UniProtKB/Swiss-Prot annotation:
<feature type="transmembrane region" description="Helical">
    <location>
        <begin position="397"/>
        <end position="417"/>
    </location>
</feature>
<keyword id="KW-1208">Phospholipid metabolism</keyword>
<feature type="topological domain" description="Lumenal">
    <location>
        <begin position="89"/>
        <end position="148"/>
    </location>
</feature>
<feature type="topological domain" description="Lumenal">
    <location>
        <begin position="1"/>
        <end position="36"/>
    </location>
</feature>
<dbReference type="InterPro" id="IPR007318">
    <property type="entry name" value="Phopholipid_MeTrfase"/>
</dbReference>
<dbReference type="GO" id="GO:0006656">
    <property type="term" value="P:phosphatidylcholine biosynthetic process"/>
</dbReference>
<comment type="similarity">
    <text>Belongs to the class VI-like SAM-binding methyltransferase superfamily. CHO2 family.</text>
</comment>
<comment type="pathway">
    <text>Phospholipid metabolism; phosphatidylcholine biosynthesis.</text>
</comment>
<dbReference type="GO" id="GO:0005789">
    <property type="term" value="C:endoplasmic reticulum membrane"/>
</dbReference>
<feature type="topological domain" description="Lumenal">
    <location>
        <begin position="257"/>
        <end position="322"/>
    </location>
</feature>
<dbReference type="InterPro" id="IPR016219">
    <property type="entry name" value="Phosphatid-EA_MeTrfase_fun"/>
</dbReference>
<feature type="topological domain" description="Lumenal">
    <location>
        <begin position="446"/>
        <end position="505"/>
    </location>
</feature>
<keyword id="KW-0472">Membrane</keyword>
<feature type="transmembrane region" description="Helical">
    <location>
        <begin position="506"/>
        <end position="526"/>
    </location>
</feature>
<feature type="topological domain" description="Cytoplasmic">
    <location>
        <begin position="344"/>
        <end position="349"/>
    </location>
</feature>
<keyword id="KW-0949">S-adenosyl-L-methionine</keyword>
<feature type="transmembrane region" description="Helical">
    <location>
        <begin position="323"/>
        <end position="343"/>
    </location>
</feature>
């Protein structure tokens, strides 16, 4: 502890300057540092452990000494977690030890009681000559003595554990020449770095729980290892336990290590965490930490029929709704599969194939829904156009996602279980326990993710209900403080745990690779692009990534990977450029125009294409023939405006059975002399009495004259003959009762009317006028039989192309074509989709 730090007592507020102190290892083993009586005793106690081990091995044998040191380790571990825990709890709540020292004047000069003499002697021998214990507050003196007992317990705890591990090593050193030793040594080295870096950050003050006694008036910068894991001294600070267990290859050591680590977590939960909340308040989160939870509440408040979704949480489910059938279906399916395993005993091969196929298919379904929802709002539109609400579509997605998760993990569970009970599978207990630990890590990771982003984030709510997000910023609290995408690695830890449990069976390796690949695809190619689009390109940097970026070699490797990614991206972009540039070249014939129109989608490019087509295509006429469209000055017609064609042909070319057809130029571009496609009823006679039985086609003839030299007339295509699909069309005059083309008009464009969606009432009025003009209204409702060319499908297309809103046939039929209800629905859908943008 630095001498320039200012501290103050917790209750009285007395300020003082703490003396310089040293860490545990230097205090005990550095010969240049003064040693107190207790420190000498601690050192002798540690040496006695080794002497006792050597003597005991000679006298009692290996098995007895392993039991003896296991008992010692358990004793000292309980002294640590229970003894120190109780002492700190009393000090935190009641300041028991400092108050005792004050009441009994333990550090008062002239007090000759045995306790006071011993405590004062201990501090005098420990501290430098310049330290005046009588002028310092009792809180500091008690803490300095408390450190001595902590040193004894912690060093004995460590020493007895290490001796127990040593006694559990394989008899043959050659048995340790494997991958487990390499991984174990790496974990031990990592553990050492964690402890050293943690002490660099918190110093002796926090290492010895100084804030239980007094408070420092300084800001600690929690960087380094504190960016990697929550409570690193209690979590990853015990990685060495598992590294030593791997090296030993003894599951007894692993179980002892797990027990010791578990006791440490209990110490954290019941001693440290409550004190932190009392002293510093609950852990502060970023301003957006509660946004997702608030969104869940907002959804439930605004939608009275909404209830929290069922969520798979390992071997249990949360939010089970007794009145929701899908919950029974999900749970029932999982239970049925487990019963099937025990009753039918399916083969391992069948279970593997079924698990692999199910995971593959459900991943495709989930990825497809998320991708289409992100790019097109497809899933929401699917339900909106069928008369359902936005939140209802989200509820259906929640069921799909959770059911897929339950189904695949249930199948993985029974597949692993069947593999374990297979006669050909060797169960190595150490690997099996490590596999269970990985499953526990995944369960913990999922719980932390849900705690950080709530149900809304767990079910990708920002894909479906982005309009419910009040502040669009990514959360950086909880597990997301350390990992940017924790589900990518820790989210499949349990799946790789099954690989360890089954002794690296190829089936479970294949399943783990599939799980990891699917997770990677969702995060890298779907989730990250969507997050960038919704929240901006300022990506969140996790604590682990931030720490690694501070390391030179890792930073250079990261820069190299970024360059490779940029090269790949640019190469893909350059391959696309020639195609894009080709679209910009002018089209000089009608075939090029149509290819051009297929690609161009926005309105400006569409208008340019129309100009290109009309400007470069002339009507094709026989000599002395006339074939003109009236009022073609604007080169376009807004539906359902009637179109009149004036025609004239020499008498020798005229035939009473001649007719005029309306075609999309994309269909007729291949042949200008013969029409090879059907007009599908979009045709008119040129003579009023030519085609008996085709009344609507004859009624289109408005003028007809014939003399000795020419025949001429007018034909008007109204809503009963026009196409209601936007595009570029042409009229063709056919000679006689054939498909031989005599005349072709100039191309023109058919456009949909612009409807006003300012209010449902205005839209209702305009729709009613439009449908009346095309004879598709009966009793104020849409009548799909009123105009054979204005069917329900055409009405859907009109609404989609003109208003950008889709309605399903089922919905239109459900409301019986009610224009008012349809108008209300269109405005609602449009508002929802606009809010999602």
């Amino acid at each position: 502890m630095a001498s320039d730090v200012v501290a103050r007592t917790r209750s009285s507020g007395v300020t003082f300057t703490p003396p310089t102190t040293h860490d545990m290892v230097r205090s005990l083993f550095d010969p240049t540092v003064r040693k107190s009586f207790l420190e000498i005793c601690i050192t002798l106690a540690l040496l006695s452990d080794f002497v006792f081990c050597y003597w005991g091995l000679q006298r009692f044998g290996l098995t007895s000494m392993k039991k003896a040191f296991l008992a010692q380790y358990l004793f000292w571990r309980l002294c640590y977690n229970l003894g120190i825990g109780v002492a700190l709890h009393l000090q935190s709540r009641y300041e028991t030890w400092t108050n005792y020292a004050k009441r009994n004047h333990v550090f008062t000069k002239g007090n000759h009681t045995p306790l006071a003499r011993f405590c004062q002697f201990e501090l005098k021998t420990k501290m430098s000559e310049g330290y005046d214990m009588y002028s310092q507050p009792e809180e500091l003196n008690v803490w300095l003595l408390f450190r001595q007992f902590v040193d004894l317990i912690l060093m004995q705890d460590f020493c007895t554990y290490m001796i127990y591990v040593y006694l559990s090593l394989p008899a043959q050193w050659s048995a340790m020449l494997n991958w487990r030793t390499g991984l174990g040594v790496s974990m031990i080295l990592f553990n050492i770095w964690v402890k050293v870096d943690a002490h660099r950050v918190v110093k002796d003050y926090a290492w010895y729980w100084g804030d239980f006694f007094f408070l420092q008036e300084s800001e600690l910068v929690f960087d380094g290892v504190f960016n990697i894991s929550p409570h690193p001294m209690y979590s990853i600070g015990y990685m060495g336990y598992y590294g030593l267990s791997l090296i030993c290859g003894n599951y007894h050591v692993l179980l002892v290590s797990i027990s010791g680590h578990l006791l440490q977590f209990l110490f954290l939960k019941y001693v440290e965490s409550p004190h932190m909340e009392i002293t510093y308040g609950s852990e502060s989160s970023d301003d957006n930490s509660q946004i997702n939870s608030c969104i869940d509440d907002l959804i439930a408040t605004k939608n009275y029929d909404y209830s929290r979704p069922l969520i798979n949480s390992g071997f249990w489910v949360n939010n089970f709704d007794k009145l929701r059938f899908t919950d029974y279906f999900t749970v029932g399916t999982s239970l049925a599969l487990i019963c099937w395993l025990f009753l039918e005993r399916p083969s391992v091969k069948l279970l593997f194939n079924l698990t692999f196929f199910t995971k593959f298919v459900t991943s495709i379904v989930v990825c497809s829904i998320l991708y289409l929802q992100s790019s097109q709002k497809w899933f929401t539109k699917l339900y909106l156009k069928n008369g359902y609400t936005q939140v209802y579509s989200y509820q259906q997605w929640q069921f799909i996602y959770n059911f897929s998760s339950c189904l695949t993990y249930t199948l993985l569970f029974i597949q692993t279980l069947a593999k374990l009970f297979d006669d050909n599978t060797y169960i190595e207990y150490t690997q099996f326990i490590f596999g269970l630990l990985l499953c526990a890590v995944q369960t913990w990771c999922n719980a932390e993710i849900r705690s950080a982003i709530s149900d809304f984030g767990w079910f990708y709510g920002d894909f479906f209900l982005s309009n419910y997000i009040p502040t669009k910023s990514l959360t950086s609290h909880g597990i997301y403080r350390y990992l940017n995408n924790p589900e990518t690695i820790l989210g499949v830890a349990g799946v790789w745990g099954t690989v360890l449990m089954t002794d690296f069976s190829w089936e479970n390796i294949a399943l783990a690779c599939l799980w990891s690949g699917c997770n990677f695809i969702i995060v890298k190619f779907i989730e990250q692009p969507h997050m960038a689009k919704l929240y901006g390109d300022n990506t969140r940097v996790g604590g682990i990534e931030k720490t690694l970026q501070g390391l030179g070699p890792w930073r250079r490797m990261s820069e190299l990977m970024d360059r490779v990614e940029n090269v790949i991206t640019k190469s893909l972009t350059n391959q696309q450029e020639p195609f894009d540039k080709g679209l910009e070249k002018p089209r000089k014939d009608i075939k090029s125009v149509n290819n051009h129109l297929r690609v161009r989608t926005n309105s400006q490019e569409w208008e340019e294409a129309v100009e290109d087509a009309i400007g470069n295509v002339t009507s094709k006429l026989y000599p002395d023939c006339k074939f003109e469209i009236e009022d073609l000055g604007e080169k376009s017609f807004i539906l359902p405006r009637p179109i009149t064609i004036r025609w004239q042909v020499p008498i020798e070319l005229f035939d009473e059975d001649a007719w005029i057809g309306l075609y999309n130029i994309i269909q007729t571009r291949s042949n200008s002399k013969t029409t090879k496609v059907s007009s599908s009823g979009h045709w008119s006679a040129v003579s009023p009495n030519a085609y008996k039985g085709y009344e609507s086609n004859n009624l289109a003839v408005t003028e007809f004259e014939k003399n000795d030299t020419v025949a001429c007339g007018k034909v008007t295509f109204d809503s009963s003959l026009l196409h209601f699909k936007p595009g570029i069309y042409e009229f063709r005059y056919h000679a006689g009762n054939s498909h031989n083309v005599l005349c072709t008009s100039k191309p023109f464009e058919l456009l949909l009317p612009n409807l006003d969606m300012e209010t449902p009432e205005i839209l209702n009025k305009q729709l009613l006028q439009l449908l009346t003009s095309v004879s598709a209204v009966k009793n104020g409702k849409f009548d799909s039989h009123g105009n054979r060319y204005f069917t329900t499908r055409i009405f859907q297309r009109l609404v989609k192309d003109s208003l950008g809103v889709e309605l399903s046939t089922d919905y239109i039929n459900r409301v019986n074509g009610d224009i008012g209800a349809i108008s209300q629905r269109i405005c609602h859908i449009k508002k929802v989709l606009d809010d999602l943008e």
